[in-house]
Swiss-Prot record:
CDD domains, alphabetized: cpn10
Subcellular compartments: Cytoplasm
One Gene Ontology biological process: chaperone cofactor-dependent protein refolding
UniProtKB keywords: Chaperone, Cytoplasm
A cellular component annotation (GO) from this entry: cytoplasm
HAMAP family according to UniProt: CH10
Chief location category: cytoplasm
Subunit (UniProt): Heptamer of 7 subunits arranged in a ring. Interacts with the chaperonin GroEL.
Organism: Prochlorococcus marinus (strain MIT 9515)
Matches recorded under SUPFAM superfamilies: GroES-like (SSF50129)
Name used for this protein in its record: Co-chaperonin GroES
Secretion signal, residue range per the UniProt entry: none
């Protein structure tokens, strides 16, 4: 079997799932103290990298996702599946776990 090369462009979310590039977490506190990885909080903000086709309704139609590629979003803290890709952090989650679009 051939090896699969994963890149952001090859990840195609299914249904109402959204693929988000996680924003960098703070490296130090407001007072200037450097934080170890174990003390950093999991970021809840990221940029939409890929969008699924939308939720399938009972009548067979699709519900169009409310977010688009490039949108900056706020999502639930423990939502989705964490994925590392090319040194960057991503999360794959359901659209219902997105709380807001940030402008």
């Amino acid at each position: 079997m051939a090896a699969v090369s994963l890149t952001v462009s090859t990840v195609k979310p299914l249904g109402d799932r959204i693929f988000i590039k996680v924003s960098e977490s703070e490296e130090k506190t407001a007072g200037g103290i450097l934080l170890p990885d174990s003390a950093k909080e999991k970021p809840q903000v990221g940029e939409v990298a890929q969008v699924g086709p939308g939720k399938l309704n009972d009548d067979g139609s699709r519900q169009t996702p409310e977010v688009s590629i490039g949108d900056k979003v706020l999502y639930s803290k423990y939502a989705g599946t964490d994925i590392k890709l090319g040194g960057d952090e991503y999360v794959l989650l359901s659209e219902k776990d997105i709380l807001a679009v940030v402008s």
